[in-house]
Amino acid sequence: MIQQESRLRVADNTGAREILVIRPLGGSVRRSAGIGDVVVATVKEAAPGGTVKAGDIVKAVIVRAKKETRRPDGSYIAFDENAAVIIKANDNDPRGTRIFGPVARELRDKKFMKIVSLAPEVL
């Protein structure tokens, strides 16, 4: 589970490399977030010449999490790293034009279709 102060790898080409979670969105007492949840974060590390720079406040959706997620058929999915994709503030479209690495199938259920279509692999 992703919580406040968690550091996530960025899985898109916006120029950000690492973000730090400020807060998971969805309720005033929400403590943690999982795959498909939206978080508010700050960019901690960024590549020069990117569309975002270090210190920017962004919204991101979690696409990979180390903590296993249970699926309706009883199986579990877990990844080797915690990763997110930066999205636009007003809708669920990604700010970047490419997605790196696999993403979870749960994103399709949560209406992040553009991220699913850009991803090289959906697990």
Swiss-Prot record:
Keywords: Ribonucleoprotein, Ribosomal protein, RNA-binding, rRNA-binding. PANTHER family: 50S/60S RIBOSOMAL PROTEIN L14/L23, LARGE RIBOSOMAL SUBUNIT PROTEIN UL14M. Belongs to the universal ribosomal protein uL14 family. The gene is rplN. This is Large ribosomal subunit protein uL14. The keyword Membrane does not apply. It comes from Corynebacterium jeikeium (strain K411). The keyword Protein biosynthesis does not apply. PROSITE patterns: RIBOSOMAL_L14. GO terms for biological process: translation. Gene3D superfamilies: Ribosomal protein L14. GO terms for cellular component: cytosolic large ribosomal subunit. Pfam families: Ribosomal_L14 (PF00238). Part of the 50S ribosomal subunit. Forms a cluster with proteins L3 and L19. In the 70S ribosome, L14 and L19 interact and together make contacts with the 16S rRNA in bridges B5 and B8. GO terms for molecular function: large ribosomal subunit rRNA binding; structural constituent of ribosome. Binds to 23S rRNA. Forms part of two intersubunit bridges in the 70S ribosome.
